Amino acid sequence: MSAIQHFFKTFFLTELLQGLALTGRYTFKRKVTVQFPEEKTPISPRFRGLHALRRYENGEERCIACKLCEAVCPAMAITIESETRADNTRRTTRYDIDLTKCIFCGFCEESCPVDSIVETQILEYHGEKRGDLYFTKEMLLAVGDRYEKDIAAAKAADAPYR
């Protein structure tokens, strides 16, 4: 930049005027604020919300206790204990997720070879005490059973992009 251009930019404060013009444009535009509990915005099919454990159509849980999700979790929010059954298959006896630690990165869902752990599109959940956000295997299976149709639809919508 030449010295003359630099002089005119600093003397006439062009950057300041550009910023004020931008502020002025947004002052008179329609506002985009959403009043959350009453109004809702559309949720992406890839939204990562509350976790759920899925079952097969015959009612058997999908988790094979490979512990990949526990290993890949950067926040160490997943705890898994497993045992071998009589038919030599491994299943979980304990599958806990501490949502106060979870950063909702989706690594657990991506690493699962059988699509057992998924993150649903549920974003409205709360806990009155700290322990309320500690989800056990039974709670995760209940979420999966309740929202299986929504989970399957979201998986089908996202399938072409995987």
Curated annotation (Swiss-Prot):
It catalyses: a quinone + NADH + 5 H(+)(in) = a quinol + NAD(+) + 4 H(+)(out). It comes from the Bacteria. GO terms for cellular component: plasma membrane. Residues 54-83, 93-122 form the 4Fe-4S ferredoxin-type domain. Its EC number is 7.1.1.-. It holds the Pfam family Fer4_7. GO terms for biological process: aerobic respiration. [4Fe-4S] cluster 1 binds at residues 63, 66, 69, 112. Its main location: membrane. [4Fe-4S] cluster 2 binds at residues 73, 102, 105, 108. Its cofactor is [4Fe-4S] cluster. It is found in: Cell inner membrane. Binds 2 [4Fe-4S] clusters per subunit. NDH-1 shuttles electrons from NADH, via FMN and iron-sulfur (Fe-S) centers, to quinones in the respiratory chain. The immediate electron acceptor for the enzyme in this species is believed to be ubiquinone. Couples the redox reaction to proton translocation (for every two electrons transferred, four hydrogen ions are translocated across the cytoplasmic membrane), and thus conserves the redox energy in a proton gradient. This is NADH-quinone oxidoreductase subunit I. It comes from Burkholderia lata (strain ATCC 17760 / DSM 23089 / LMG 22485 / NCIMB 9086 / R18194 / 383).
